[in-house]
């Protein structure tokens, strides 16, 4: 009898072990710096320049290495405060398992313009905030009703229709969404600390990538810190510490949300709020 019980226990344990995910769960999303050569068409000749962008990835699937992303590359020459023409905007898309191309373009184009136009940190901060969150939401799976609300805050050319400040107030007014916002900001802030002084810029003479200016990282870091202070003041709660981030991530990312293709998706049902348009 004891032998049978031991055998049954062993078989069950094998089953549970087999059911465990076979890979370590990374943070649900991360931002990657992209540096590339871009050809800008001209009336007389074709010029090549370097472009820098940030793009947000979803979790790399367990069995399918594809992902959804849409990235907008923009020239960032320091004597240029605005994108010179629409021909200098290039779109690079990767298709996800279902063939869907992300509708959101994450490049912080307006934020970069504000930075080089010497706009106030507050204005940059809200713009950065809403594009970070919109990019995160667009890189994961969430209910169609929330997708409808999200699309309504952007126009066809991806410009924001809703005030970034209004979107900020809506997102931080709900606990579940606020936690996600703080995680996104924490990730981006950590990324900036790691990358400070290691970014790239174009050297005009050699046309080679050189270290990016410290001022860029200073402005973005200051913008993130500003938003975190606003959240703390708005909600009367401290910014999330590592333990709380880990616990929220563990709730949001779970093997039970894995679909048939092996993609880990975000449990975003708590985002649904049909009473207030986004």
Swiss-Prot record:
Membrane spanning stretches: none
UniProt-annotated location(s): Spore wall
Coiled coil (UniProt feature): none
Sugar-bearing residue positions: 79, 259, 267
Keyword Acetylation on entry: no
Keyword Signal appears in the UniProt entry: yes
Disulfides per UniProt: none
Gene from which this protein is expressed: SWP30
Name by which UniProt lists this protein: Spore wall protein 30
Any Gene Ontology biological process: sporulation resulting in formation of a cellular spore
Alphabetical keyword list: Glycoprotein, Signal, Sporulation
GO cellular component: spore wall
Signal peptide positions on this chain: 1-19
Organism: Nosema bombycis (strain CQ1 / CVCC 102059) (Microsporidian parasite)
């Amino acid at each position: 009898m004891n032998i049978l019980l031991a055998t049954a226990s062993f078989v069950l344990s094998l089953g549970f072990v087999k059911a465990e995910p076979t890979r370590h769960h990374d943070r649900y999303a991360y931002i990657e710096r992209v540096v590339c050569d871009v050809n800008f068409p001209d009336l007389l000749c074709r010029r090549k320049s370097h472009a820098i962008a940030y793009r947000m990835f979803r979790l790399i699937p367990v069995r399918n290495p594809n992902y959804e992303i849409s990235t907008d590359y923009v020239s960032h020459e320091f004597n240029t405060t605005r994108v010179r023409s629409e021909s200098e905007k290039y779109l690079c898309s990767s298709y996800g398992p279902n063939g869907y191309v992300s509708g959101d373009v994450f490049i912080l184009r307006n934020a970069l313009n504000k930075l080089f136009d010497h706009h106030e940190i507050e204005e940059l901060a809200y713009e950065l905030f809403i594009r970070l969150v919109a990019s995160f939401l667009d890189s994961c799976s969430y209910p169609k009703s929330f997708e409808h609300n999200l699309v309504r805050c952007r126009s066809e050319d991806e410009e924001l229709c809703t005030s970034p400040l209004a979107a900020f107030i809506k997102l931080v007014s709900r606990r579940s969404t606020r936690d996600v916002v703080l995680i996104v900001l924490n990730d981006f802030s950590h990324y900036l600390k790691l990358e400070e002084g290691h970014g790239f810029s174009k050297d005009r003479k050699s046309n080679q990538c050189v270290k990016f200016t410290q001022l860029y990282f200073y402005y973005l870091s200051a913008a993130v810190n500003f938003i975190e202070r606003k959240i703390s003041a708005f909600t009367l709660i401290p910014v999330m510490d590592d333990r709380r981030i880990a616990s929220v991530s563990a709730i949001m990312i779970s093997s039970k949300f894995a679909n048939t293709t092996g993609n880990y998706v975000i449990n975003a049902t708590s985002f649904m709020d049909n009473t207030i348009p986004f």
